[in-house]
Amino acid sequence: MSSVEVVAQQLLAAEHPRRMGKGAAADPRRAALGELTNLNAVAATNGKVGPSKKPSKASCAQKPKPTELVAPMIQTGAAASAPVSAKPCVKEEQLCQAFSEVLLAVQDVDEQDADQPQLCSQYVKDIYKYLHVLEEQQPVRANYMQGYEVTERMRALLVDWLVQVHSRFQLLQETLYLTVAILDRFLQVHPVSRRKLQLVGVTAMLVACKYEEMYTPEVADFSYITDNAFTKSQIVEMEQVILRSLSFQLGRPLPLHFLRRATKVAGADVEKHTLAKYLMELTLLDYHMVHYRPSEVAAAALCLSQLLLDGLPWSLTQQQYSTYEEQHLKPIMRHIAKNVVLVNEGRTKFLAVKKKYSSSKLMKISLIPQLNSSTVKAMAESLHNP
């Protein structure tokens, strides 16, 4: 046989593999299919290692046989795995659907701020998540003055005086909140005598001014405001003690930061915002509220404000952004209501905050009739009789 005839036969065999006598082209095709469909395992179970008969001439009756063998194996494999994957898929779909429904009910309050870079709409959610973490890292313990020479009444007297000093110096709102935060954080780790309490107070305000204000009052001004009870050197020395005790960590979030965010989320007007500020400032004098986080105080103040002015409940959107449900805020709202009743009924001498918010500049918000309503009184009474 010539080499030309050999090549011709090879070409013919390549074009018509079934015409070859020993089925050489059929076996690899079946072996590959067997690897995918576990036909090898079935063949081993039946005791068949390979084809026992020579493949006969291809006919119409023989063509469907491989299909009949392969199809049941594929269907059986799918059917066997279907019960395992069906339940997780259904459960996952239900969870996704429920989560989507919750998200659809929550309004994206930052959606309209994309063209205003100063509002940081892309990062504002992350910023407030960080503030929530930060306030937990710098807590104030409940009843931290237990066993101290300084009492809660002395603390209230000092804070009431600091509110007046703050107004006298015309300082930023943040400065007052930071002053009280520094005061409480310092006193819980460094007890002082009654004689030095006022020194700690004015020094805390000096530190807060340096942190918040553009133009800080001089040390001599703080010495003068104490009627020269403390010298400039004493104030500077106490400043060093406070900063070392706090490890120079002054960036504790303030209730005012969270209130501004909560007001935006609620779409509250100026009256609701101002009333919430008044309610928050009353809490500065309350020793029994020092352990509440700033975000909790802000949320509770706005929740009570919108309840008194418009009778509005705490919405799902407010719950989502504040991370607090209304049920969680109710105990804090009772404390706030108690403080309102105390100043309205003249059961306390510390009235600097009420006088401050009775000015026309602050809408005379402390004089509105809603603060004398039965709702406020009922909340205050429920604090002692839950």
Curated annotation (Swiss-Prot):
It comes from the Eukaryota. The keyword Nucleus does not apply. One of its GO terms (biological process) is cell division. Residues 45-64 are annotated as: Disordered. The keyword Cell division applies. Keywords: Cell cycle, Cell division, Cyclin, Mitosis. InterPro entries: Cyclin, Cyclin-like_dom, Cyclin-like_sf, Cyclin_A/B-like, Cyclin_C-dom, Cyclin_N, Cyclins_cyclin-box. CDD domains: CYCLIN_CCNB1-like_rpt1 (cd20507). Pfam families: Cyclin_C, Cyclin_N. GO terms for molecular function: cyclin-dependent protein serine/threonine kinase regulator activity. Essential for the control of the cell cycle at the G2/M (mitosis) transition. Interacts with the CDK1 protein kinase to form a serine/threonine kinase holoenzyme complex also known as maturation promoting factor (MPF). The cyclin subunit imparts substrate specificity to the complex. Belongs to the cyclin family. Cyclin AB subfamily. This is G2/mitotic-specific cyclin-B2. It comes from Oryzias luzonensis (Luzon ricefish). The gene is ccnb2.
